[in-house]
Amino acid sequence: MLLILGHMVNDMFSNLLSGLLPIFTVLFDLSYVLAGLVAMVFSVTSSLLQPLLGRWFDRTQTTWLLEGGLALNCFGMSLVGISPNYVVLLFLVGTAGIGTAAFHPPAFSTVARSSSASRGGSMGVFLSGGNAGFFLGPIVAGLLVSAFGLQGTLLLLPIGMLTALLLLRVRVSERPEPSLTKSTQPPNRRLLGLLATITALRSITIQVGVTFLPLYLVAKGESLLVATGVASIWLGVGVLGQIAGGHLSDRIGRRPVIVFSLFVGAAIFYGFLMTTGLISIILLALSGGVLFASWSVIVTMASEAAPDNVGAVSGLMLGFSIGVGGLAALGFGGTADMLGLQTAFYIFGAFAIGGGMLSLFLPKDTGDVGSVMVVK
């Protein structure tokens, strides 16, 4: 439970930026490209370091990465509200990115190694904590700014630091002995490469949604509070999809869930873009539930493909997810500057469909470790 709480708080801080970006865009007179660069700095700093820190954790079991990473993420994001200029904003966002890069590998590794009977379900529950944090991030940002102005982000600093202190207990209560979890199974590099590519394509669609949905809704005439609230609904239903996808993959297999999630989720998201009013909000929520259902399944499948390198593999998957998504945010911003936000969403939604096409080449399985591992 402490890991789920820590994941929720960590990812809440990570997604504060989504709710604050419309304000910084006005405050610093940013184009969509420069707004996308803010998201990209966070994404690139975390994605470049995450696989390296994951590999280091697999070899050394360095315990302080978990709570230290959360504390650094919290520190950087809590201070963004008092950024005097754009350069300082980029520096603080980059600092937070380093923190989340340190947090995730030991957290993923602990979950994967401590749950063997139903990896998909356990990973889904753990990842739902992160999605819950993503859901809360824009809402918390909107409420704080409405009540206290941008400097209200400082009020979150004690929450993050207290949670980091609580994670010290994970050292003795939830972290397994690595010597008891070793396997002789070599990593399935071909499968890992395919999963990383699917992750990258999927993340392009999702990251531009996380970053630009509030801006899109504000451009449509909604207030910042309504825009961040509606965007959070997308992420909130994604929490349920994350849990459902993980448990369903334990029953019917990993590949069917991933294929359905990417094809159907993208189709529903296009429906959101084509409609207005209540129907549009319902379709947006449904697309979140379906699109996010694939993430826990992909991470589980990757950890099964390399059981002795879960930290490195989870870092690779999340690094691809955050890094490519961040680069996509910059590209999306440029496209939106030229063609408009709605046209840019139409273009970038197609990447999830590309991920769905590649997922057809994943091995057939029944959700157990062996069926994944024997595929060459």
Could you describe each region identified by the protein language model?
Residues 126-172:
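Helix-loop-helix hairpin linking two adjacent transmembrane segments in secondary transporters
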